[in-house]
Amino acid sequence: MHTTQKDTTYTKIFVGGLPYHTTDSSLRKYFEVFGDIEEAVVITDRQTGKSRGYGFVTMADRAAAERACKDPNPIIDGRKANVNLAYLGAKPRIMQPGFAFGVQQIHPALIQRPFGIPAHYVYPHAFVQPGVVIPHVQQAAAASTSPYIDYTSAAYAQYSAAAAAAAAYDQYPYAASPATTGYVTTAGYGYAVPQPLTAAAPGTAAAAAAAFGQYQPQQLQADRMQ
């Protein structure tokens, strides 16, 4: 003879977060105010007989179960518990307002990186000056022992005079010039290296422009025809 099992999908309640001193009778006593109870049991450890901190309560009807689950975090035996229908599973506790926030995960590659810039593009503070934008550094041009190009004040000094002369003759793509530091000469023609990040002093630029004042556009045109 087969027995018909009652459907408890909407009447069986899971109760979690119970204190260890909660018993079947104390659990039943709490839920009696919501309606008739068919069963109330606290799950215990088989070896020690102590409560595992959760239990199940089966209400007589669905309406009673809904009333019992209206408060998802009731205080049972002095401790905040969590209540939900058993078929839905355990419901997480509601955290206090002061702690109801999550910590954003930080990518390991951005840890200990100033401004979140990858390591290859992080420049030492000695190279970053107010108003100066350092261009993109190619990896092939970087030093073998460091990802940064050694731009020092001494390295800038040798290009200051060349930068002033190049600025004075920007309109001539190929200008004849004597052997000057910072210029590369080949086949009688010279071209200026790219201007450095720091501009030359006004006095230096004026002196360089005066030194090349003797070259007239006609002479430069003749030099290009050679």
Curated annotation (Swiss-Prot):
<keyword id="KW-0694">RNA-binding</keyword>
<dbReference type="GO" id="GO:0061158">
    <property type="term" value="P:3'-UTR-mediated mRNA destabilization"/>
</dbReference>
<dbReference type="GO" id="GO:0005737">
    <property type="term" value="C:cytoplasm"/>
</dbReference>
<dbReference type="GO" id="GO:0003730">
    <property type="term" value="F:mRNA 3'-UTR binding"/>
</dbReference>
<dbReference type="GO" id="GO:0006397">
    <property type="term" value="P:mRNA processing"/>
</dbReference>
<dbReference type="Pfam" id="PF00076">
    <property type="entry name" value="RRM_1"/>
</dbReference>
<dbReference type="GO" id="GO:0010831">
    <property type="term" value="P:positive regulation of myotube differentiation"/>
</dbReference>
<keyword id="KW-0539">Nucleus</keyword>
<dbReference type="GO" id="GO:1905870">
    <property type="term" value="P:positive regulation of 3'-UTR-mediated mRNA stabilization"/>
</dbReference>
<dbReference type="GO" id="GO:0008380">
    <property type="term" value="P:RNA splicing"/>
</dbReference>
<dbReference type="InterPro" id="IPR050886">
    <property type="entry name" value="RNA-binding_reg"/>
</dbReference>
<protein>
    <recommendedName>
        <fullName>RNA-binding protein 24</fullName>
    </recommendedName>
</protein>
<dbReference type="InterPro" id="IPR012677">
    <property type="entry name" value="Nucleotide-bd_a/b_plait_sf"/>
</dbReference>
<dbReference type="InterPro" id="IPR035979">
    <property type="entry name" value="RBD_domain_sf"/>
</dbReference>
<comment type="function">
    <text>Multifunctional RNA-binding protein involved in the regulation of pre-mRNA splicing, mRNA stability and mRNA translation important for cell fate decision and differentiation. Plays a major role in pre-mRNA alternative splicing regulation. Mediates preferentially muscle-specific exon inclusion in numerous mRNAs important for striated cardiac and skeletal muscle cell differentiation. Binds to intronic splicing enhancer (ISE) composed of stretches of GU-rich motifs localized in flanking intron of exon that will be included by alternative splicing.</text>
</comment>
<feature type="domain" description="RRM">
    <location>
        <begin position="11"/>
        <end position="88"/>
    </location>
</feature>
<keyword id="KW-0508">mRNA splicing</keyword>
<dbReference type="GO" id="GO:0035925">
    <property type="term" value="F:mRNA 3'-UTR AU-rich region binding"/>
</dbReference>
<dbReference type="GO" id="GO:0030154">
    <property type="term" value="P:cell differentiation"/>
</dbReference>
<keyword id="KW-0221">Differentiation</keyword>
<dbReference type="GO" id="GO:0005634">
    <property type="term" value="C:nucleus"/>
</dbReference>
<dbReference type="GO" id="GO:0000381">
    <property type="term" value="P:regulation of alternative mRNA splicing, via spliceosome"/>
</dbReference>
<dbReference type="GO" id="GO:0097157">
    <property type="term" value="F:pre-mRNA intronic binding"/>
</dbReference>
<dbReference type="GO" id="GO:1990825">
    <property type="term" value="F:sequence-specific mRNA binding"/>
</dbReference>
<dbReference type="GO" id="GO:1990715">
    <property type="term" value="F:mRNA CDS binding"/>
</dbReference>
<dbReference type="GO" id="GO:2000766">
    <property type="term" value="P:negative regulation of cytoplasmic translation"/>
</dbReference>
<keyword id="KW-0810">Translation regulation</keyword>
<dbReference type="GO" id="GO:1902811">
    <property type="term" value="P:positive regulation of skeletal muscle fiber differentiation"/>
</dbReference>
<dbReference type="GO" id="GO:0006974">
    <property type="term" value="P:DNA damage response"/>
</dbReference>
<dbReference type="GO" id="GO:0061157">
    <property type="term" value="P:mRNA destabilization"/>
</dbReference>
<dbReference type="GO" id="GO:0043488">
    <property type="term" value="P:regulation of mRNA stability"/>
</dbReference>
<keyword id="KW-0963">Cytoplasm</keyword>
<dbReference type="GO" id="GO:0045663">
    <property type="term" value="P:positive regulation of myoblast differentiation"/>
</dbReference>
<dbReference type="InterPro" id="IPR000504">
    <property type="entry name" value="RRM_dom"/>
</dbReference>
<dbReference type="GO" id="GO:0010830">
    <property type="term" value="P:regulation of myotube differentiation"/>
</dbReference>
<dbReference type="GO" id="GO:0048255">
    <property type="term" value="P:mRNA stabilization"/>
</dbReference>
<dbReference type="GO" id="GO:2000738">
    <property type="term" value="P:positive regulation of stem cell differentiation"/>
</dbReference>
<keyword id="KW-0507">mRNA processing</keyword>
